Regions:
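Class I SAM-dependent methyltransferase SAM-binding "motif I" and its flanking Rossmann-like core
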Residues: 107, 111-155
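N-terminal glycine-/serine-/threonine-rich phosphate-binding loop
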Residues: 1-23
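Ligand-binding beta-strand-loop-alpha-helix segment within the catalytic cores
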Residues: 45-106
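ATP/nucleoside-binding phosphotransfer catalytic cores, i.e., glycine-rich phosphate-binding loops
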Residues: 156, 160-206
Length: 206
């Protein structure tokens, strides 16, 4: 089954069961093709809540904004009707309730093994990387490339989902993924260590 079809079926099943569904997306170039395919699928999109797993703390129309990426490549065509929630520290606690557990979380991975905005220099942070930590969305100092301050979900909140899809694109990233199973210096190690049954990895060997 294709990744897009798996995401569609999970969202559609949740809508039929509870009347709404939640979809958490990542930025970067890896998911763009999936965004475009998914946005054209017939689904009651007005019943789908969409947010980001992380973002850079820049204006929404900035080229480095993940929100800008989502608006340009996903929230168009049929998916334009979806309910979009910018990522904020109080997203899962404020009154305009965002559905949890999340139905689908779509993640990418960097060449340093980071996912979301959880980077190697943060591994010793209990709140960021421990699966038993309290659910949290928090701001970070400047990280990554581009070197900018960020906002991100922590690992325990990401794991609070019915399905996680990890996209890994390119030979160098695939090598990092293979190493991460036994290398606890790589952030992605902690995601892989805690993966559950509905954890999909799409490897794109380019």
């Amino acid at each position: 089954m294709s990744t897009v079809k798996s995401i569609y079926e999970r969202l559609n099943s949740s809508i039929k069961r509870s009347g709404t569904a939640s979809l958490v997306l990542s930025g970067g170039s890896s998911p763009i093709k999936i965004f475009e395919e998914l946005s054209s699928i017939d689904l009651p999109w007005s019943k789908v809540q969409v947010t980001l797993v992380d973002d850079r703390l820049v204006e929404a129309d900035n080229k480095d904004s993940n929100q800008n990426l989502i608006l340009n490549y996903f929230l168009k065509s049929k998916a334009k009707a979806a309910q979009f929630f910018p990522l904020t520290e109080d997203l899962i606690t404020k009154s305009n309730f965002f559905k949890t557990p999340f139905d689908v979380v779509l993640l990418g991975m960097g060449e340093d093994g980071h996912f979301a905005s959880l980077f190697p220099n943060m591994i010793d942070d209990f709140d960021a990387f421990n699966s038993d930590a309290k659910f949290k969305i928090f701001k970070t100092e400047s990280q990554g490339n581009p070197f900018l301050p960020r906002i991100t979900m922590n690992l325990s909140l990401i794991l609070n989902s019915e399905m996680i899809v990890l996209l890994v694109k390119g030979k160098s990233k695939l090598k990092v993924l293979d190493e991460a199973i036994n290398n606890n210096k790589l952030p992605i190690h902690y995601l892989l260590k805690n993966r559950k049954e509905n954890f999909l990895i799409e490897k794109i060997n380019e």
